[in-house]
Regions:
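Extended, compositionally biased
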Residues: 74-99, 320-332, 600, 605, ...
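Alpha-helical scaffold segments that mediate packing/assembly in large oligomeric complexes
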Residues: 141, 145, 159-163, 310, ...
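Structured, hydrophobic secondary-structure cores that serve as assembly/anchoring elements
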Residues: 1-66, 74-81, 520-670
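A glycine- and small-residue-enriched flexible loop/hinge signal that marks low-structured segments
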Residues: 77, 144, 152, 371-557, ...
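Residues at beta-strand starts and edge strands
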Residues: 28, 114-118, 287, 318, ...
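N-terminal polar alpha-helical/low-complexity "assembly arms" that mediate subunit docking
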Residues: 1-117, 343-367, 375-397, 402-431, ...
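Extended, beta-strand-rich, solvent-exposed assembly scaffolds of outer structural proteins
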Residues: 51-59, 109-337, 397-400
């Protein structure tokens, strides 16, 4: 039997440190961003959706956002991949209010009604709203009605978007004879019919309503028919009503969905009355409005100074939304607290989201804010006309921003201006202006007013559907199509004029025995000239950036010598020698050769040869032409080495273009 011997761990002499050499980063996805004015998207956030069903679930199947998303997620006819995601952000055309929107309730109305009591407190920019013993959910007849009860419990009324004087119900001297009721000295508005006023007074039975008017001033002094016989005799009759008679509107416009509240307080304010519809009068002004109190009852006041504005609490997207009564950058609503808040998903932990108040957006500032939140996208479009259908001021500001981003993003700009279809020099048109200024990165896309062909969404789909991983995956936007898109241009003259002014469009073409519809020609403003060339450089430059970042973060040191420069060269061009590609591609240049972003055997002009030779410091034009690329790494100076800055690294590559028109001669030889 041998004795146990204590030993020294082998790691003392040879220590193996496990590790993984990463496969690298996935790189930029050329997905689209859509700017909407829909307040359902929280201000300051960028929402990402993986597919059309997710967009429809959030916005609604018939929403504008869903209509554009349907075009986007369909890609284009013949594509081998579809967009991986779609982004949305809210662009406030005017100042907007802050809000907190609760997570989806995911409960039945009966389950909500079972919440019998609870406390809730909300801090807003105008003060603290609180109800220590909210008990109204058992009375709720719907989720929207539950929101109305919450609005009554948390009165969050600002100065109001519309103000006026209103009469609710009436008082009069009444005389009854059977079901005939004569009203004299009427103060207020008498309504009749299925939703007629409820009337009370001595000699008037309970639950008596006014059915019709037989004579007298309409809705004023006269003879009415009631559902019950009355014996009132020259005494006061009081009517309560579902209708609000707004006798004058001092400021603003009254809209359906607005909440009415008495200036300085009043009992009907506690019922959060909502405007259902306008019955008569000046649209949005003085007139009669059908209202709905939270308890389903009638108004019983006579005359008040009233303000109207959006309700403080609404039911949106399956959750309760609490909004500030003010708009602009100072508008604020904090996440609610109290025992009720988590039960109805109004806390951050239960899925509530916060939207900040904001002033009317400015394109450059807004887009910079979007990039600070999410920069993993390539194209953007607006689902609205930034200029409201007149002029180009705001569209040019978006174009100016994209021009300032060093070719990182493309603006897909829909324009309905008719003038670029009418002449080759439509000097006031957006495309012409961009062409004259050489502003880069905007894709002007023409469609007629009300055309609705969603060409910008197809352009975004094209960029997001190009399969850069496939051999010859590169594509042009020209000749791309999608079922259901209606052609905007059917005239060769109009098409030629649009092209001359820098626009693309969706066209219909035909010949004997054939007909086609497609996007054409695929231009982009600025030096890249073509939309496909622009997105190709986005992809290639991003791949180079990621490859070099992976190199720098994966090795101990990259020296300023042949070994260091060789590592850079291998990182960028490995597997791409002499124009050939070993699959799978091992480097950005190899991948570019494989997918067609880099094209070999393209001749250079004499002028191009001079420029590229000058950039490289030696004659490279023949090599560049033959293999499609050339990487120049010039040794760093002593000053550069001392500062540990970059050596001069220049990648030149041949785009190769694309044949988009064919003219052929057909000659019979006898």
């Amino acid at each position: 039997m041998s004795a146990s011997i204590t030993t020294i761990p082998a790691s003392y002499f040879v220590d193996i440190v496990p590790g993984v050499i990463g496969a690298g980063q996935p790189g930029l996805t050329l997905i689209g961003l859509m700017l909407t004015t829909n307040p359902i998207v929280p201000v300051g956030q960028v929402l990402s959706f993986p597919n059309l069903a997710a967009v429809q679930s959030y916005f609604g199947a018939s929403a504008t956002e869903s209509v554009h998303a349907a075009v986007y997620f369909a890609g284009y006819n013949g594509c081998t991949k579809i967009p991986a995601a779609l982004l949305f952000a809210q662009y406030p055309l005017t100042a907007v209010a802050a809000y907190v929107r609760g997570g989806a309730l995911n409960m039945t109305l009966a389950q909500l009604q079972a919440i019998t009591t609870g406390s809730i407190t909300v801090i807003t920019d105008t003060g603290t709203l609180t109800d220590a013993t909210f008990t109204q959910f058992p009375s709720a007849t719907s989720f929207a009605n539950a929101a109305q009860w919450l609005s009554a419990a948390l009165p969050n009324h600002g100065p109001g978007l519309a103000t006026g004087t209103a009469i609710m119900g009436f008082t009069a001297t009444g005389t009854g004879s059977g079901t005939a009721l004569t009203l004299a000295s009427v103060s207020g508005y008498v309504s009749f019919g299925p939703s007629g006023d409820s009337v009370t007074g001595t000699g008037i039975p309970s639950n008596t309503t006014i059915v019709s008017q037989t004579s007298g001033t309409p809705n004023g002094a006269g003879v009415y028919v009631t559902n019950n016989a009355t014996t009132i005799s020259g005494t006061t009759a009081t009517g309560s009503s579902f209708f609000l008679d707004v006798t004058a509107v001092a400021t603003g416009t009254i809209l359906a969905g607005y909440e009415a509240f008495v200036v300085g307080g009043g009992s009907f304010t506690d019922e959060a009355p909502l405007v259902i519809s306008q019955v008569s009068g000046t649209t949005g002004g003085a007139g009669v409005y059908l209202m709905a109190l939270a308890n389903g009852g009638r108004f019983n006041q006579v005359s008040e100074a009233v303000s109207f504005g959006p309700p403080g609490v609404t039911y949106v997207n399956g959750g309760f939304q609490i909004s500030s009564s003010t708009t602009g950058a100072g508008s604020f609503v904090d996440f609610p607290t109290g025992t009720l808040a988590p039960l109805i998903n109004l806390t951050q932990a239960t899925g509530a989201v916060q939207s900040l108040g904001a002033a009317a957006a400015v394109p450059a500032t807004f887009m910079a804010g979007i990039v600070s939140v999410d920069r993993n996208w390539a194209t953007f479009e607006t689902l609205f006309d930034p200029d409201g259908g007149s002029g180009n001021t705001q569209k040019l500001l978006f174009a100016a921003w994209v021009n300032s981003t060093s070719y990182q993003f493309a603006y897909l700009c829909t324009d309905t201006d008719i003038t670029p279809t009418e002449s080759t020099t439509a000097t006031g048109s957006l495309g012409y202006i961009l062409g004259q200024s050489n502003s880069s990165g905007t894709v002007p896309l023409w469609q007629p007013v009300g055309g609705g062909n969603h060409l910008a969404s197809l352009a975004a789909a094209f960029a997001a559907s190009v399969n850069f991983n496939a051999t010859n995956g590169r594509a042009t936007f020209a000749y791309k199509s999608q079922a259901g898109i209606v052609p905007a241009v059917t005239s060769a003259t109009a098409l030629s004029n649009l092209i001359a002014n820098g626009y693309g469009s969706y066209v219909a073409a035909a010949t004997a025995g054939g007909a086609w519809q497609f996007a054409y020609p695929g231009q982009i403003s600025g030096p890249f000239a073509w939309f496909d060339s622009f997105i190709n450089q986005l992809w290639l430059n991003n791949q180079c950036q990621i490859a070099l970042m992976t190199l720098l973060t994966s090795i101990g040191r990259l020296p300023y010598n042949l070994a260091g420069y060789a590592a850079i060269r291998q990182t960028l061009t490995g597997g791409a020698q002499a124009g050939a590609v070993v699959l799978p591609p091992a480097s950005p240049v190899a991948a570019g050769l494989n997918n067609g972003v880099i094209t070999p055997n393209v001749p250079l002009s004499a002028e191009q040869a001079i420029v590229v030779n000058s950039l490289a410091g030696l004659t490279i034009a023949p090599t560049l032409s033959a293999q499609g690329w050339y990487l120049s790494i010039q040794p760093a100076t002593a000053a550069v080495r001392a500062a540990r800055q970059s050596p001069t690294v220049i990648l030149l590559y041949m785009d190769g273009g694309a044949i988009q028109q064919i003219d052929m001669s057909s000659l019979l030889v006898q």
